[in-house]
Amino acid sequence: MAGGGGAERVRVGAAAAGLLPPSCRQPRRRESRERLSVCSKLCYAVGGAPYQTTGCALGFFLQIYLLDVAQLDPFYASIILFVGRAWDAITDPMVGFFISKTPWTRFGRLMPWIIFSTPFAVISYFLIWFVPDISTGQVMWYLIFYCIFQTLVTCFHVPYSALTMFISREQSERDSATAYRMTVEVLGTVLGTAIQGQIVGKAVTPCIENPPFLSETNFSVAIRNVNMTHYTGSLADTRNAYMVAAGVIGGLYILCAVILSVGVREKRESSELQSDEPVSFFRGLKLVMNHGAYIKLITGFLFTSLAFMLLEGNFALFCTYTLGFRNEFQNILLAIMLSATLTIPFWQWFLTRFGKKTAVYVGISSAVPFLITVVVLDSNLVVTYIVAVAAGISVAAAFLLPWSMLPDVIDDFKLQHPESRGHEAIFFSFYVFFTKFTSGVSLGISTLSLDFAGYQTRGCSQPSEVNITLKLLVSAVPVGLILLGLLLFKLYPIDEEKRRENKKALQDLREESNSSSESDSTELANIV
C-alpha cells in the first residue's frame, strides 16, 4: 500500500509539471469544494434502512413474540433480550477495531464489510422469527441466532456509520447527507413497523382467558394440557405471519445494500494519501476516550436514547394490555413512525437555523408531556393516536441529532490531534456500544420485572401489578432519563460558534496540507 501512495505522488507531480493531459490531472483545491449530488446522498441514505428496519421490528415485536408466540417463560425471554443486546454492544468496538486494521481496497476500506456481511445477516434474521419444532433447546436457538444476527448487522452498520466521514470533506455536505440518511432511517422504521405490524396484525394471536389453572389436581392438569395443545395449534397462522414479515424485510435489506454499494464511493483524506501506516487502535481508543467533547456528548445521548429504547421495547405490551388496544397497537406504532419521518426535514431546518444544542433541548424535551399524558388519562383511542403523532416529532429529533453532532466531535478531535488518523470507526462504534449495552441491561431488567409482577403468557388480561409496571416502563422511567440526559447536555462544549471556528481551522489545515503536498510533488516532477 505504501507503494500506491508513492505512485500517487508521482502522478500528481507529473501533472504539475505538465507531463499528463489536463483530463488526467487531479484538481486538489477544487476537490475540497465539490458538492455531493442528490443521487449520491440518496444512495448513501438508503444504506441506513436495513439496520433501522430490522432493529425496529426486533425492538417492537421480539419481546411479545418470545412471550406470546414462542411461549417462552419471561425469565428466559429476559435472558435472551439482555444477552443479545449486550453481545450486540460488545461487537461494536470489536468490529471498529478490525475496521481500523483493514487496508484500503479498490472498493474502499468500509464497503467490503457491508457487502460480505449482508447475505448471512438476512439468513440469521429469518431464523430468529422461526419457531423450531423441538421440545427443548428453544432458548438456545433464539439466543444463538439473535447473537449471530447482531454480529452481522454490526458488520454492516459500524462501517456504514463511519462512511459519513468519507463521502465528503465538506462539513455542510456531510450534514446534508446525514439529514437524508436520518429521513430514510426513520422511513426504515416506518417500513419495519408497517411490514411487521400489518402482516402479523392480520393473524390474530389467540389469548387465554384465565391462565394458568391454579388447581393442581390431575383433572385440571389434564385439561390444561389439552387447552395448551389447542392454543399451540391455533398459533400456526401467527407464526407463519412472522416468517413472511421476516422474508419481506430480508429482501429489503439486500436491496438497500446493493443500492449503497453501487451508488456510493469512499473518499480518502488528502493527507491519508501520503501514508498508509497502520493505525494503532488502542492508542486511538485512549485518545478518543480522553476527548472531553465526545464523552459529554455520548453521556447525554446515552440517557435520552435509553429512554426511547425502553419505550420501544415495552410499548407493544403497554398498548395490548394496559390500554387494551390489542388489535390497534401496530397502527399506533405506525403513527409514531410516520410522524417521525415527516418531521425529520423540519428538525434539519431547525438545527441549521437555531443550532444543534437548541434542537436537542426543544426536540427531545417535547416528548415529556405526552409520555405523561398517555398514562394519566383514561384509555382513549383518539387521545392515544394524538399522543403517538406528537411523540413521533420528538423521536425524529432523537434520531437525527446524535448522528449530526458526532461528525462535529470528530472534527474537533482532528484539530486537537492532527497526527492521529483512521479513528472514525472508534467514535461511532463506541457510541453505539454504550447505547446498546445499557439498553440491553434495561430491556432485560424490564422483562424480568414483568415476570416478578406476575406476567401471564398469552393472557387476555394481566394482573394490576403488571399494568402498573408497564406504566412505569413507558412513562416515569423514560421521563426521568430524558431529564437527566438534557441536564448533562449543558456540559457539551461545541456550540455553533465553536463549530464554525473548527470548520474554518480544519479547512485551513487541509489547504496547508494540500499546498505542502503539491510543493513536494512539483519538486519531484522537476527531478523527473
Curated annotation (Swiss-Prot):
Residues 1-37, 100-109, 162-176, 264-295, 352-355, 405-427, 491-528 are cytoplasmic. Disulfide bonds join C207-C460. Its main location: membrane. One of its GO terms (molecular function) is fatty acid transmembrane transporter activity. Residues 503-513 have a biased composition (Basic and acidic residues). The chain crosses the membrane at residues 38-66, 74-99, 110-129, 139-161, 177-199, 242-263, 296-319, 329-351, 356-376, 382-404, 428-450, 468-490. One of its GO terms (cellular component) is plasma membrane. InterPro entries: MFS_2 (IPR039672), MFS_trans_sf (IPR036259). Residues 503-528 are annotated as: Disordered. It is a multi-pass membrane protein. Keywords: Cell membrane, Disulfide bond, Endoplasmic reticulum, Glycoprotein, Lipid transport, Membrane, Symport, Transmembrane, Transmembrane helix, Transport. It comes from the Eukaryota. It holds the Pfam family MFS_2. Residues 514-528 have a biased composition (Low complexity). It catalyses: a 1-acyl-sn-glycero-3-phosphocholine(in) + Na(+)(in) = a 1-acyl-sn-glycero-3-phosphocholine(out) + Na(+)(out); 1-(4Z,7Z,10Z,13Z,16Z,19Z-docosahexaenoyl)-sn-glycero-3-phosphocholine(in) + Na(+)(in) = 1-(4Z,7Z,10Z,13Z,16Z,19Z-docosahexaenoyl)-sn-glycero-3-phosphocholine(out) + Na(+)(out); 1-(9Z-octadecenoyl)-sn-glycero-3-phosphocholine(in) + Na(+)(in) = 1-(9Z-octadecenoyl)-sn-glycero-3-phosphocholine(out) + Na(+)(out); 1-hexadecanoyl-sn-glycero-3-phosphocholine(in) + Na(+)(in) = 1-hexadecanoyl-sn-glycero-3-phosphocholine(out) + Na(+)(out). It is found in: Cell membrane; Endoplasmic reticulum membrane. Sodium-dependent lysophosphatidylcholine (LPC) symporter, which plays an essential role for blood-brain barrier formation and function. Specifically expressed in endothelium of the blood-brain barrier of micro-vessels and transports LPC into the brain. Transport of LPC is essential because it constitutes the major mechanism by which docosahexaenoic acid (DHA), an omega-3 fatty acid that is essential for normal brain growth and cognitive function, enters the brain. Transports LPC carrying long-chain fatty acids such LPC oleate and LPC palmitate with a minimum acyl chain length of 14 carbons. Belongs to the major facilitator superfamily. This is Sodium-dependent lysophosphatidylcholine symporter 1. It comes from Gallus gallus. The gene is MFSD2A.
